[in-house]
Amino acid sequence: MEPLSHRGLPRLSWIDTLYSNFSYGTDEYDGEGNEEQKGPPEGSETMPYIDESPTMSPQLSARSQGGGDGVSPTPPEGLAPGVEAGKGLEMRKLVLSGFLASEEIYINQLEALLLPMKPLKATATTSQPVLTIQQIETIFYKIQDIYEIHKEFYDNLCPKVQQWDSQVTMGHLFQKLASQLGVYKAFVDNYKVALETAEKCSQSNNQFQKISEELKVKGPKDSKDSHTSVTMEALLYKPIDRVTRSTLVLHDLLKHTPVDHPDYPLLQDALRISQNFLSSINEDIDPRRTAVTTPKGETRQLVKDGFLVEVSESSRKLRHVFLFTDVLLCAKLKKTSAGKHQQYDCKWYIPLADLVFPSPEESEASPQVHPFPDHELEDMKMKISALKSEIQKEKANKGQSRAIERLKKKMFENEFLLLLNSPTIPFRIHNRNGKSYLFLLSSDYERSEWREAIQKLQKKDLQAFVLSSVELQVLTGSCFKLRTVHNIPVTSNKDDDESPGLYGFLHVIVHSAKGFKQSANLYCTLEVDSFGYFVSKAKTRVFRDTAEPKWDEEFEIELEGSQSLRILCYEKCYDKTKVNKDNNEIVDKIMGKGQIQLDPQTVETKNWHTDVIEMNGIKVEFSMKFTSRDMSLKRTPSKKQTGVFGVKISVVTKRERSKVPYIVRQCVEEVEKRGIEEVGIYRISGVATDIQALKAVFDANNKDILLMLSDMDINAIAGTLKLYFRELPEPLLTDRLYPAFMEGIALSDPAAKENCMMHLLRSLPDPNLITFLFLLEHLKRVAEKEPINKMSLHNLATVFGPTLLRPSEVESKAHLTSAADIWSHDVMAQVQVLLYYLQHPPISFAELKRNTLYFSTDV
């Protein structure tokens, strides 16, 4: 199931909140960071993580948002007659093909749900029934009707898509599908009872419990997986999910359908019916979001919930935090034995009337948080990527489902640890009657959302109170039913048919902003989701004393399964009394924030795409383009052999009559002169426009190079050096030797590894070898300053390894099948190769060439 928040569908939160009194496998997370982690149980299917962006607010409706991300009650405009009609119709085909594939999966899921119904009915009239006729009719209510509706729809749509031409019409099929939504209304009304009945029957009948825990869903026709095991509980949820997906497709189809096309009015009508249906469902469901009453007798409602990392007793714990209309409650999911209803355990609560945010001065006095070592976080990411690759290989080779489940469990455990240990941005709250609490977040956007939601509620006339033990028990008990976020935000919780996100490089130019009421010192930061959570990736310069900043700064952001881009606009604080000594304590004022989805169809083009994000009356203009991982593997030789970028290193050194290219020597010299103590040197991106300017100067062999280098930001110089190595026609350690490096680093015997790795260095062409040894010694000198610059040998190997050593384009095509694989394939080994040489005693070019075998006394 794809993330839904960005589509602006009316009141989407109903999908998550709908009768949420059932459990999912990954809800059995261990809230205590120091206890053994639990992954999803075998055979269970988990709901995907739902983004908590503002468009997912329980109070959101299409009419209340007034533009922005919300969708107006009227359908989106189609293509004007004759305007890019051919392109639009081709997009229609792509949209329909994707929907048809997911429709096939849905029909297979319904078939799997219906499969046990007939034998259960057959036993119902015997002396030993598994279920009664009444129980069967309750659990499987309307499933047969829904199956027949969608089977007919699929059978009619499939030939139209397979035999596609520009004149094909299918609007009448969607119109008919929408007209049958009454069946779904009946299903939804019965849904809660169906789940309760299924749960009771599972507890009282072992035979039915076995059936309901492992239903076999047939894989799609083209899939190598013949069957997957899914729980009945998860399958009963599928029809609810399907209504929303069908409505999303109608939006997409209308967007790419010419207004004068015969399908256009039919699709409009289908969308109108679907939206009315969703609205009516929301009206029915909203009352179920209520919990107990407030001290003033008003209904207490859940406003926001989500998973946050709390620092408690000097260790990190994953908590589920619930914000009600008058209280903030921090809870942990209790561990329960199989078959028992899951419950939350309240760790603490603060009435909003007593909740205050500490000032920067007060925060400074509180205990500071020591970040988790970067190299350990990188190791976790490498393990996760390697496990993803293994899972893909197992699936491709039709591996055993148990083996795949074991790998998935390992991946979940590593993702959980990464989620627990990576956040560093403090979010401090204080109970004016006592204790303070500290959460760590990875995103300032998310911290701002929590703060704003609390402050908005605090504007009301709130009263202080103390909950009795019974009241607290009732409130905590309601959390399981009311929660809107069911799973911790890790990628292993995604459905197989859900978009894996984008892997590659996103180039973003932040142009300008307007709409500020007065002049200020302004800058922007960019966040993207990575490994299931958001992280800050780039920051513009501060534009001083202006109401209309024009940054025009370009950034290259690496995407790792990313689906969203966030832009935050800040006013810089120069008042020393307000500046916190904790580097992670951002005290600058957020002026606005916004988020867009990284739609593959929009960004996966070679051209720049310009857009505007609106935030609190502020408009930020930016452009972006995306380069996929497989495209970034391609090294394009320079057309003009007079430059240095994209030109063979042997050609450059011969032309310059040097052993190491001039660009490498100059960049290294400048970094060692004034950047060796720069925090995050080589890891933090330089401004892309500065890097491109330096590239042009080096390519032109301009006489002003040295002057320009001395004035340029040091991160731009470091970025230029990395870009030079990345744009070599082949990697510095060569395509030819790549497989041998991979085999050498995998050797177990230290002596054999030593001889192999040194022999491989000797096999490099002289310009490559001398340049590599020169770079090696430089990186070692950078790592000597690790206490100051925070760049260890491991960090530097992570940055440079995949640049100096990567598979050739031919090998990539031969072995890799997906973007995620391209990212993860051999990355760990590439890092380990460079790390091996960085940790090795100094390597002499002369000694390497003198010895046919290289022996080390350390082995």
Swiss-Prot record:
It is found in: Cell projection, Dendritic spine; Cell projection, Axon; Synapse. Its main location: other. Residues 91-284 form the DH domain. Residues 301-459 form the PH domain. Residues 54-64 have a biased composition (Polar residues). One of its GO terms (cellular component) is axon. Residues 647-845 form the Rho-GAP domain. Changing residue 859 to A: Abolishes interaction with DLG4. No effect on synaptic localization. One of its GO terms (biological process) is modulation of chemical synaptic transmission. Residues 26-84 are annotated as: Disordered. One of its GO terms (molecular function) is GTPase activator activity. Highly enriched in the brain. Much weaker expression in heart, lung and muscle. PROSITE patterns: C2, DH_1, DH_2, PH_DOMAIN, RHOGAP. Residues 484-613 form the C2 domain. The central Dbl homology (DH) domain functions as a guanine nucleotide exchange factor (GEF) that modulates the GTPases CDC42, RHOA and RAC1. Promotes the conversion of CDC42, RHOA and RAC1 from the GDP-bound to the GTP-bound form. The C-terminus is a Rho-GAP domain which stimulates GTP hydrolysis by RAC1, RAC2 and CDC42. The protein has a unique structure having two opposing regulatory activities toward small GTP-binding proteins. Interacts with DLG4. Protein with a unique structure having two opposing regulatory activities toward small GTP-binding proteins. The C-terminus is a GTPase-activating protein domain which stimulates GTP hydrolysis by RAC1, RAC2 and CDC42. Accelerates the intrinsic rate of GTP hydrolysis of RAC1 or CDC42, leading to down-regulation of the active GTP-bound form. The central Dbl homology (DH) domain functions as a guanine nucleotide exchange factor (GEF) that modulates the GTPases CDC42, RHOA and RAC1. Promotes the conversion of CDC42, RHOA and RAC1 from the GDP-bound to the GTP-bound form. This is Active breakpoint cluster region-related protein. The gene is ABR.
